[in-house]
A protein has these predicted regions:
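Conserved PLP-enzyme active-site core in the AAT-like
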Residues: 1-118
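Conserved C-terminal alpha-helix-loop-beta "cap" of PLP-dependent enzymes
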Residues: 100, 119-191
Length: 191
């Protein structure tokens, strides 16, 4: 989960067994470390017959998944966070609540302003009552509706004209840091 962060959404409370979060985005907050977080509820039943790859780990009970990850990823592939990246993430984590509160508030204000002042532009933001995702977002998100909103202006050409007319946002593809971004998804996601 890149967009909601653990501050806004706690999937374990909604029945998820394992949660994957990118800590390179909002948790870090400065785009200066690449990392992720795996959270295991410990509730999944790792039956060794159904999941033969876990046969050696079922003895660890609720820690079976973590034990396998530690053995497979850490030992065999070296997937260990560098100490400096852990430090940089911890600095960002200290201000996550405040940053998400402000960014969610700004996103809602901007989405509302666009929706109220530009009826020809379609705004997608789960915090808007007009959003088809609003009711789901109210149930699943706490402390805000996220800092990402999308708009539809009608065509790729109009989108680039709109983006190029902006003066404050950067045209970058890394979300979740200290910069306000305006990007078009097609060229960004297909490069």
């Amino acid at each position: 989960n890149c967009f909601a962060t653990p501050y806004l959404q706690q999937p374990l409370k909604h029945g998820a067994d394992i949660v994957v979060n990118s800590s390179s985005k909002y948790i870090n907050g400065s785009s200066n470390a690449i990392s992720g977080i795996l959270t295991d509820s410990g509730k999944f039943k790792w039956d060794k017959n159904r999941y033969p790859g876990f046969a050696d780990y079922v003895k660890y009970g609720p820690m079976a998944f973590v034990a396998k990850l530690r053995n497979s990823l850490f030992r065999n592939m070296g997937a260990c966070l560098a100490p400096v990246n852990a430090y940089l993430n911890s600095i960002g984590l200290e201000t996550l609540g405040l940053r998400m509160e402000r960014e969610c508030s700004n996103a809602l204000d901007l989405a509302s302003w666009i929706e109220n002042n530009y009826p020809d532009i379609k705004v997608n933001y789960p915090g808007l009552c007009s959003s088809k995702w609003h009711e789901i977002a109210k149930k699943q998100l706490t402390n805000g509706y996220g800092a990402i909103l999308t708009i539809r202006v009608g065509s790729k050409e109009k989108a680039f004209k709109f983006i190029n007319s902006l003066t404050i946002p950067y045209t970058l593809s890394n979300i979740g840091d200290t910069k306000t971004l305006a990007i078009h998804p097609f060229p960004t996601l297909r490069t």
